[in-house]
């Protein structure tokens, strides 16, 4: 009887010591975000993963070239990118590729002519 009580106590302590999932994340989802999927679509390529838990350590399961694969996760800044109502007449020119390329709270956002660093939209 005493051994069963100790096992039950140990199990409860182990479960209670697990940190809760971060707010807004699904169970098993890793922190960080996916890099932008700017690559061309490769047809008929099977997904390499379906969820983050299938990826090693610091990698996330993200869409890249139109199929899911394990890629290095990127840091995500708060706020959303403002909408761009312009149309580009020149070739695409990316001034950044991910939020970490931008200073301070600025985010790497899609614009009419490529990606550039912008202050996040308020709201």
From Swiss-Prot:
Signal peptide stretch: 1-24
One GO molecular-function entry: serine-type endopeptidase inhibitor activity
GO cellular component annotations of the record: extracellular space
An annotated GO BP: antibacterial humoral response
Keywords from the named record: Disulfide bond, Protease inhibitor, Repeat, Secreted, Serine protease inhibitor, Signal
Keyword field contains Secreted: yes
Pfam families: WAP
Disulfide pairings: 34-62, 41-66, 49-61, 55-70, 81-109, 88-113, 96-108, 102-117
Cited InterPro entries: Elafin-like_sf, WAP_dom, WAP_four-disulfide_core
PROSITE patterns, per the entry: WAP
Localisation: Secreted
Main location: secreted
Domain WAP: 27-73, 74-121
Function as written in the Swiss-Prot or TrEMBL entry: Putative acid-stable proteinase inhibitor.
The protein, known as: WAP four-disulfide core domain protein 5
Higher taxonomy: Eukaryota, Metazoa, Chordata, Craniata, Vertebrata
